[in-house]
Amino acid sequence: MTRLLLALVLALTTAVSFAPSASAELKVLVEGPGNFKPTPLAIPDLEVRGTNSDLARQIVEVVRADLESTGLFEMQNPASFIQKDLSIDVQPRFADWKIIKTDGLVVGAFEELPDGKIAVSFRMWDVYAGEVMRINGQPGRRLTTTPDNWRRIAHKIADSIYTRLTGEDPYFDTRIVYIAETGPKLNRVKRLAIMDSDGANQQYLTPGTNTVLTPRFSPSAQEITYMSYEGGRPRVYLFNIETGRQELLGNFPGMTFAPRFSRDGESVLMTQAEHGNSDLYIMNLQTRQSRRLTDHPAIDTSPSMSPDGRSVVFTSDRGGSPQLYVMNTDGSPRTCPSGGRDVACRITFNKGQYSTPVWSPRGDLVAFTKQLGGKFYIGVIGTDGTGERLLTEAYLDEGPDWSPNGRVIVYFRESRPGAGPQLWSVDLSGRNERRLQTQTEASDPAWSPLLQ
């Protein structure tokens, strides 16, 4: 039976943490010291066993770009390669790769199968140890698919390399939903749009007849919840990506906005505003029954649930200015970091205003937007209010969301007054800020789970 695995054998030494050694476990530090240097990695073109050399070359280009985008790897220039006659079935000449100071070498083959599918096999070598690094106990991996699905093969290859070298969960084979913005400011068109994590395959999901905001993926990555002004007032909707079906979620009085799925996908958290007061609600998607989470005269908004489903972080101005609070999902009192017990505990006490909190998939951090001194920041803080770190700074940085492995944050930025919004990402070290290319101006990004 054909194994839907990707033939990949990789081994690398990191110049960051230790000198090359045949006996040491090869790891790349995700959060290295201040003098961090990317690990040199060589990925030659695939050995083509067929006629479609263009597709084979494109697959390698995506793998290289994915890995280089992390800031952890330095892709060696193919023009510098001494050994040209590489084969997945033959051990490489390691001396040739040491000369150009390559720590890791990835060798692969591309095949066109009789049934019309394609297969990609990979082996990856530790240049200094002169040996293969096994993945899940196997010396290689192989993955097959239809030709039109070639980009997913590339992302899965990059995911395998990244995970084996860093020990972190993967995140390349994912999608990003966002708001595509066009037109003048007084007649702005805002549409739901979706793309691969690297910006490829961009498409619109809604026609732009109604303004939409704050899209969020379901845990299955098959549905999106968002706010739409359809019908003249902001309300929360569900959108099925496969069918294109849009559905109003509840018929609350007043307005509903800032939705987000629960971690199990069975409920949606949202804000409901009526008569000048905003509180948090959670709705069961099977029964369509809703339960009120907060009941306070202040403005409570932007709820995000912890990975275990037991807690919710949100923004409230109940202390006089927008700050971050944490509460138990069942509404019971909890012990607060500042001492005492309360239904909702404040976790931000530094200068500035805090908003749009998002709980990390790892459970240890909350990402947020901070406004202070005329500037905006994307930052992270421990769930107990300790260890605040600001990762970005700009005229306007807003709307963070996590990659599924909790190592990268996507957000949108306006670099100066009058500049249109663009999507950016940053890793937890704060040193790898990158702009994500979109066809239009873009805001309100959200990252999907890994695709199945």
Enumerate the predicted regions with their spans.
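Short beta-strand->alpha-helix linker/helix-N-cap micro-motif
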Residues: V30-R93, V106-E112
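Residue-level detector of Asp-centered blade-edge/turn motifs that repeat once per structural unit
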Residues: P170-F172, P219-S220, R263-D264, P307-D308, ...
